[in-house]
Amino acid sequence: MRGLIPDHMLERGRTVLDSYREPVERLLSERRMPEEGWPDDVIATFLWELSRMDTDKDPKAARIGEREARVASRLAEESVFGFCHGVGRSGTLVDPQPKAPGASIMYALTNRLVTDFLRRLGFRIEGAFVVPGATGLSIALCLSALGEGEEVIYPYAAHKSPIKAVRLAGFGMRVVDTEIEGDRIVVDPGDVEEALERSESPAAVLSTLTFFPPRSSDPLPEIAELCEEYGVPHVVNAAYGIQHEQYRDLLNRAIKRGRVDVVVSSTDKNLLTPVGGGIVYAPDEETLREVSRAYPGRASAAPVAHALISLLSLGMKGYRRLMRRQKECKALLDELLEDLEARRDDVRVLDVDNPIASAVAVEGHDPVDLAARLYVRRVTGPRGVRADDPFGTSRLRGYHSNYITINAAIGVREEDVKTAVERLERELEGE
């Protein structure tokens, strides 16, 4: 470029270019989550540069394989930033793919970043990787890799995804029923131990860290201790467990006290990505390697790219800011619901100890119908459960109240919370 414009102008232009290159060079060198988030155009340029390393971008290549990243539409290619070969090999999900050097770098870098991200949030782990499948599929992958017996011990939670995951992995299920303590639905560690003793061939314990109230988190430290004592793998469903310190602290106590093989969280619920990705993390890297070997075939790069985009866009500061806002919105939600309770005889805020969601008993109202009417009023997310519903209540013998749950998860806005409670009151009034 020298000689085309004056040198001082050229140097000025290089300064601008360097400002874009510098974060990329630092990322490739340090391989850590950036403190500050990146602009979208820098992220996009970085991803396209990586994807141009894949063999399907070689203009002189003779592509004669049955899988050559051919796409019918440019739109499809753009939707994955050119990573059309996907990630992984048929043997191991996290292994480099010879036809996709760029995608392999992208995947390895994403896993480095998500590990660093979790450690800096305070999780006691040795490694993590992104799975191109949401929470249920990721749980099934972990169970298929680690389970050696015939049935999974499952402290009961009203969620079809983990139940289907157990079946998909080829195991039977021994359900541990829950108990009521005040307003909370809890798991007795003694019942888990009894299930382990009665099972002739326990494959694993699938515990629950995060769930809708009034279902409480499982007693993870006690379950971890039992899994270590009985020599049974322990898989933790922490679907949205990354976004709050209460879940982190409970998980860390379990890791310190006993056996936790792997933890599964969702990328969309924690990293604000499109649905489709999971994060598997563990206190032992070899266990993660074993899980990655269980994945059948190559995988889509889209959920991995989505996770990387979110990590780079937010940075550590951006994510911590979202965590602070979530706490503020949850406090606002509780305040508004308590105010509603003080003004109405048909509403009681349940004591559930959940940092993400609140539960409200609604006397004289059908909670399922109430949640449906809120949906029509353009309030998405409330969950209505009847007291005699053995599935919805997460208790085979039912619950003492009809209730609805309202979430204030990461990414929620104050105006969302205010509008939801206002419309709830209108529906209670029958307006």
Swiss-Prot record:
For the protein in the UniProt heading, the enzyme class is: transferase
Indicate which residues the UniProt annotation says bind substrate.
R89, S90, Q97, R298
Residues modified as N6-(pyridoxal phosphate)lysine are K269
Listed A to Z, the keywords are:
Protein biosynthesis, Pyridoxal phosphate, RNA-binding, Selenium, Transferase, tRNA-binding
What NCBIfam families does its record include? selenium_SpcS
Pfam families membership:
SepSecS
According to its UniProt record, which cofactors does this protein need? Answer: pyridoxal 5'-phosphate
Record function comment: Converts O-phosphoseryl-tRNA(Sec) to selenocysteinyl-tRNA(Sec) required for selenoprotein biosynthesis.
The entry's family comment says: Belongs to the SepSecS family.
Lineage, broadest ranks: Archaea, Methanobacteriati, Methanobacteriota, Methanomada group, Methanopyri
Q: Which reaction does it catalyse?
A: O-phospho-L-seryl-tRNA(Sec) + selenophosphate + H2O = L-selenocysteinyl-tRNA(Sec) + 2 phosphate
Q: Where is this site: May act as a substrate filter by repelling compounds with a negatively charged alpha-carboxylate?
A: E66
A molecular function (GO) term: tRNA binding
**The protein's name:** O-phosphoseryl-tRNA(Sec) selenium transferase
- According to the record, the residues making up region (Phosphate loop (P-loop)) are 88-98
Binding of pyridoxal 5'-phosphate, residues: R67
